[in-house]
């Protein structure tokens, strides 16, 4: 999905609305997303919220993925410290996306780290499952 400037986002409305993670999960399953793809979607959506505020990522796949987005500006900010500037909807979405991601990672037996995914994984999710 795109904003009014044509910028692509995997969870476009996460800034303005508390998104229903169960509805997103159902939608992803309806599009035949695998459990790993669903975990990847929630991982990407979490990091997308931080990226909007100029988070500096240390995971190479996130560095490359967000570096390819025209809207992203690396301001050198620690993703863990910028939470204070999130909108209330973003704070809720960040937490809710994290819980859902953790459920899937536990089910899959993988860590919840973005290091589980490549740039190609994130790009595939963005191109096929933008909500």
Model-identified regions with their sequence ranges:
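Post-signal-peptide mature chains of secreted/extracellular proteins
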Residues: 1-131
